[in-house]
Amino acid sequence: MKKTAIITDSTASIKPGEINGVYILPLQVIVDGEKSFRDGIEIDYDHVHKLLKENPHGLNISTSLPRQSDLLKIFEEIKTKYDRFIFLPLSKGLSGTYDMLVQLAKELSEQNKDKEFLVFETSDIAISLKWLVEDIKALVDKGCDNQTIKAKVESHKQNILSAVTLKNLVQMRKGGRISGLKKFITTLLRVKPIILFDKGVNTLGAKVFSFSQAVEKIFGFVKTKFGDNYKIKRIGFCYSFCKNYANEIKKIITDFIEHNKINFQNEIENAFITSVIIVHTGIDAFSISLLIDNK
């Protein structure tokens, strides 16, 4: 059986060392256009949250690709332990990380003929990317071949949907990670935009005035994509505000599921937001990610 390492990036809501055989490549946070910090290593969620809170009208902060040197360092440290290296980066619709890894994997393959390198386009991010990593890890541990792993990635992409409800579009506009902003003008401060993340890209889905309206809209997106009789396998909940608000919204989600008799039998999973992600969402935002059971 091939000894396999999985390499994902720091947007996947996985902490270094959390999953055996899974390695985290940090993206970068750029402050004031010049100071670069590696996500989860030199800067964290709390630091970025503080900066954003101190600058409510917008902050000169952005994100950037991982450093090539960080990937090469990871590879040098683990190359003698593994025969196969599987890369599961965030969606190429959000970042150039995938393209960078494709090129680096090609170079590494030419230099290491006895190793195998596979880079997959996940169309994913955050907690649902973590789910994919966990599923691929389970297949790897069973000794599954490349075709089985590829099929799982493709199946996962077809059965996920995420939506982010924002306080405003200040940071999202700065990041340029969304289409359709020209059609959206927030004339009322209480309007909360919902960003739909589907098929690897962000689009402006709707605008609402309350958390309960946001939850209703998000499950409406799910119904539109998957039909009336969908069954939810996993629900992930991420947030960038205080715990009291988080508990309030989580209860709204749970009550909505129960009231509408939605087919979901498990617990809603919480996940931390990395500094790279909060740079774009800003504070007082939350996301709901869903994995549909297609069996």
UniProtKB/Swiss-Prot annotation:
Keywords: Lipid-binding. Transmembrane segments: none annotated. PROSITE patterns: DEGV. It comes from the Bacteria. GO terms for molecular function: lipid binding. Residues 4-292 form the DegV domain. The keyword Ion transport does not apply. Hexadecanoate binds at T63, S95. InterPro entries: DegV, DegV_C, DegV_domain_contain. It holds the Pfam family DegV. May bind long-chain fatty acids, such as palmitate, and may play a role in lipid transport or fatty acid metabolism. NCBIfam families: DegV. This is DegV domain-containing protein MG326. The lineage of its organism: Bacteria, Bacillati, Mycoplasmatota, Mycoplasmoidales, Mycoplasmoidaceae.
